[in-house]
Amino acid sequence: MKVAKASLLTILAHSVSARFLAEDEINRVQLYPAGSEPEKYLIELAPGDTRWVTEEEKWELRRNGNRFFDITDHKDLGATRLRTKTKSVFPEKCSLQDKVKPLLKDLDKSEIQKNLEKFTSFHTRYYKSDYGRQSSEWLLAKIDSIIKDAGADKNVYAQPFPHTWQQSSIIVTIPGKSNSTVIIGAHQDSINLWLPSILAAPGADDDGSGSMTILEAFRTLLKSKDIVSGKADNTIEFHWYSAEEGGLLGSQAIFSSYEKEGRDIKAMLQQDMTGFVQRTLDAGQPESVGVITDFVDPGLTGFIKKVIVEYCKVPYVETKCGYACSDHASASKAGYPSAFVIESAFEYSDNHIHSVDDTIKYLSFDHMLEHAKMTLGLVYELGFTDFTALEKKGESVSEEL
């Protein structure tokens, strides 16, 4: 898509939060340098539905509500595990209330707010920008400080997962008694879909809210001595993905690596947008969390519903978001059980995203706290699940919901 200089000026003029651009700087904004052809990317909009597009065409598709994988570098994701994939098995009910409920009391919405205020202070967290690199470096340093403050730095560790672009993904590992792994994820990047490299993208809800929600769940989880000392049956990981907005690029890279390494991933939950409830309330509906039911593992999703009922003050609603709608899709494509919980029914989700207006003022930290409760409850319950015994027992709750 080519943008005339006049159109570019109009976009910038209406973007009140954009940084100041002088006339000569606007003249230097070129979508394609003279004499060069735009780079093309292979995207997948549905299983088997692929096409080559330019980066500008990617953003145009996103502005029109289309989601996709950018499979340029990961055409074979899932090919290995497709031959070995087994049916997932999850507990019939929650069983660790005596351990989880005391931890829930330590969740602190003021911590979520404080961290989100900092996270949204970066001009953008666009994955190809220096701001995106800086925000990722801040997040990694924050995670390291949480680990150190908890006295967990002998066993728990955080590492960047570098990419070919500026912003690294982040992986935190809490070793357990086995290498079987439970993953909690969110994406750390933000985007302004008009001019990603220039315009502000605070990304408070998308996905600053999810990133800081799981950060608070992680901080609170480290208060468990059993978790920190490695007594959980399974290893636990927290992921903050880069480049979700570009076509699930960061999560594809990670799960492609895990697939090649033969990693045993028992469950992956994505938290993408956890703070917006106003459209739900305006529609006369009760506050709730949205449990995605399409392109997810039904057994894991069924257990998450039980976790919400057990540990949250708000109910859940079933909703759908389509193909490749967040990073859980990368885990699923790699052959791992994945699920996604969003802030509301999808039709009532935040309509300020991907713009300068995705700011904290629209968000509910009480609602984020409910997502944190669900996250903490799930990761603790599954962290201490003996999946080997469960599979031998033949206790399957993976039937169609």
Curated annotation (Swiss-Prot):
Transmembrane segments: none annotated. It is found in: Secreted. Pfam families: Peptidase_M28 (PF04389). Its EC number is 3.4.11.-. Its cofactor is Zn(2+). GO terms for cellular component: extracellular region. It is an enzyme of class 3 (hydrolase). Glycans are attached at N179. It comes from the Eukaryota. GO terms for biological process: proteolysis. One of its GO terms (molecular function) is aminopeptidase activity. Residues 19-87 form a propeptide. The keyword Disulfide bond applies. Disulfide bonds join C321-C325. Zn(2+) 1 binds at H187, D206, D272. Binds 2 Zn(2+) ions per subunit. Keywords: Aminopeptidase, Disulfide bond, Glycoprotein, Hydrolase, Metal-binding, Protease, Secreted, Signal, Zinc, Zymogen. Zn(2+) 2 binds at D206, E245, H354. Residues 1-18 form the signal peptide. Extracellular aminopeptidase that allows assimilation of proteinaceous substrates. Monomer. Belongs to the peptidase M28 family. M28E subfamily. This is Leucine aminopeptidase 1.
